Design a protein with these regions (language model features):
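Polyanion-binding loop/helix "lid" in catalytic or ligand-binding cores
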Residues: 29-34, 75-92, 149-152, 157-159, ...
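Ligand-binding beta-strand-loop-alpha-helix segment within the catalytic cores
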Residues: 63-142
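Short beta-strand segments
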Residues: 8-12, 48-49, 105-106, 137-139, ...
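Hydrophobic anchor at the start of a short beta-strand
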Residues: 7, 44-45, 102-103, 168-171
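Short, active-site-adjacent cap segments at secondary-structure transitions
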Residues: 15-17, 52-56, 110-113, 143-145, ...
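Internal active-site segments that recognize and position negatively charged phosphoryl groups
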Residues: 89-91, 118-182
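N-terminal glycine-/serine-/threonine-rich phosphate-binding loop
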Residues: 1-46
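Glycine-rich loop at the start of a catalytic domain that most often binds anionic cofactors/ligands
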Residues: 22, 52-68
Length: 209
């Protein structure tokens, strides 16, 4: 790991997929985010994306988050992981196309949870990638769990864990608007855009969000 603290870019599943469909990727948004990431030229970047209409429907169908209860769930565990690799592939396509040295890291191969919370993280690959100037790309995934058998690990939990473990200098949230508003700008034409927001100010506007 280089001396500079990493920056984590979190891209929500609802941003890069259409949650009203199933396996519906918003490729235009994915490409735009990749282009903006390339232009920003951030050093020591870690990317984490969610599942949206790829991971959620399958995981919900088989009750993966609640743990292993019967044999029929095993195909659901495998299928959920598979569709997440498909979405991850689309994200990887866009990043590499924009000359970003992105490298996919499957959380299912390096993370173990206990009752849904991260218990251990084998971070050798992640550290090596960062040290050598690559951009690790992780995602919400199906995970083996010490108590539940298996479960779902969200991108949000991954971001929180990585930010603490690597003392991230910044967390950037990739969204499909110009930033944080006091209302949904797609619905409210006069929604106010916050250029900067302190923790105290955020507490005051939470009720509007």
């Amino acid at each position: 790991l280089s001396e500079a603290k990493p920056v984590i870019l979190k891209i929500g599943g609802s941003v890069i997929t259409d949650k009203n469909g199933e396996l519906a990727a918003r490729t235009g948004v994915i490409n735009r985010l990749a282009e903006e990431t390339q232009k920003a030229s951030v050093k020591n970047l870690i990317v984490v994306h969610g599942g949206g209409s790829f991971g959620h429907p399958t995981a919900q169908k088989y009750g993966i988050k609640e743990g292993l209860r019967n044999e029929s769930q095993k195909i659901g565990f495998a299928e959920t992981h598979h569709v997440m690799t498909v979405l991850n592939g689309l994200v990887m396509d866009a990043l590499v196309w924009h000359n970003i040295p992105a490298f996919s890291v499957a959380p299912s191969c390096c993370v173990v949870t206990e009752n849904g919370r991260i218990k251990s993280f084998e971070d050798t690959a992640l550290k090596t990638l960062l040290k050598n100037g690559f951009v690790p790309v992780l995602y919400g995934d199906t995970i083996f769990d010490g108590k539940l058998g298996f479960t779902v690990l969200s991108g949000d939990q991954l971001v929180a864990y990585l930010a603490k473990k690597f003392a991230a200098s910044k967390i950037i949230i990739g969204v499909d608007t110009d930033g944080l508003y006091d209302a949904d700008p797609k619905v409210e034409k006069n929604a106010k855009l916050y250029a900067h927001l302190t923790a105290d100010e955020l507490e005051k506007v939470k009720c509007k969000l």
